[in-house]
């Protein structure tokens, strides 16, 4: 396995670790509605950071974006909006299926769709079937799915042991939402594929290869921001128990506390895709769709590890922790199989 591929896998791991930890600051926000908290964090992660970093990277910010036709920008934006819809469905999936089953189904579907649909759309799927390296990467995707399934099973054992149930368990509704979440969340993978002309243009301007994907986030995350912020603002305006004015009428120290924690959560959320871009840049071009598989499987891996570190698995017994550990090992094996496949 080449050093470039190894570093690509490593940066995807770092990005996934940030994704697994980003909600920790949000949990310490006090007396704010979820909608206000999510909006503040989202403004930081989807608008301020992508724009600020792109302004630093690009020699002429406005000239860069105005150089693209609508036919180039629109698919990137719409796939970003598609991914934003997946974000909204993610929370609803947890509500009706519970954390473990919801995450397992949603992540499993988005891993498959986001990884395999890209080469199909690009007409390169035959390379996966007809080459040794392609078959190895497909095997890695399958092993990753098995690992996600094992971690999901560990979560179910944990929830059963601790007596945790879904907020409003509804299998039929939950499965529909999980499938929708999985499909729509893959929009980020499709957006990155559609944004290749933007990456190439950034490279032509002398932007470091590690950073060429970052300017496209202005458009991708702009699409996601409209969906997420629109959802939050509509609820803040329509739901009687929610009030943006009330949330910002608290004591000034508490408002500052909440804003800073929400902004930190937004920063950590953004960093997952900052390092995703670094990892994506190191993956061989013919296997760039594997970035999504690495990100999603490492997200599950890091989520399990973070749970152990935070002692969320204490008092659950030996079996759930053993199953979780097995699932984490399988995901690590999957990443190595994919790495070997790309090297071939």
From Swiss-Prot:
Report the membrane topology from the UniProt record. Answer: Multi-pass membrane protein
One Pfam family, please name it.
Answer: RhaT
Taxonomically, which superkingdom?
Bacteria
Q: Name one GO cellular component term.
A: plasma membrane
Q: Where is the signal peptide?
A: none
Main location per the UniProt record: membrane
InterPro entries for this protein:
L-rhamnose-proton_sym_RhaT
Q: Which reaction does it catalyse?
A: L-rhamnopyranose(in) + H(+)(in) = L-rhamnopyranose(out) + H(+)(out)
Q: Where are the transmembrane segments?
A: 4-24, 38-58, 68-88, 101-121, 137-157, 175-195, 214-234, 259-279, 290-310, 323-343
Q: Which GO terms describe its molecular function?
A: rhamnose transmembrane transporter activity; symporter activity
Q: Where in the cell is it found?
A: Cell inner membrane
Report the family membership: Belongs to the L-rhamnose transporter (TC 2.A.7.6) family.
- UniProt xrefs under NCBIfam families: PRK13499.1-1, PRK13499.1-3, RhaT
**What is the protein's given name?**
L-rhamnose-proton symporter
